[in-house]
Amino acid sequence: MSQPLFTATVSAVGGREGKVISSDRVLELDVAMPGTPRAKKLEKATNPEQLFAAGYAACFDSALQLVARTERVKVETEVTANVSLLKDEADQGYKLGVTLQVKGEGVSASELEALVKKAHGVCPYSKATSGNIDVTLEVAE
């Protein structure tokens, strides 16, 4: 394994109906499944899919900007990650599905699509999910 540039550390207590806390305490969030009594009772609660979506969107947008800089292309981008909890018919368990919606200003749709494909090849989240999670890339017109 390569030498880490940095390591993020977060602990969970109570699973999907508990809390997550980062070692530096920047994150200290209640976790609840949407629609559960706990979720209805809490004013603000997140869930693992929402946290994954936040990380993937930020990471992919950074990868997209890296690719654009490398290609000397100036583009303003916005990435929205939709992460769904799905029933896994293979084992009757659960799995994740991801749709990344990318908007860009300053380039044509075909140029943006090419940048998105390249970003998907270098994004650490995309690398981690490759072959494990179905990821759909959508480029907004």
Swiss-Prot record:
Stretches assigned to coiled coil: none
Domain of life from the UniProt record: Bacteria
Induction: Strongly and specifically induced by organic peroxides. Repressed by OhrR.
SUPFAM superfamilies: OsmC-like (SSF82784)
Gene Ontology terms: biological process: response to oxidative stress
Classification via NCBIfam families: organ_hyd_perox
Reported function: Involved in organic hydroperoxide resistance.
Similarity remark: Belongs to the OsmC/Ohr family.
Protein name (database record): Organic hydroperoxide resistance protein OhrA
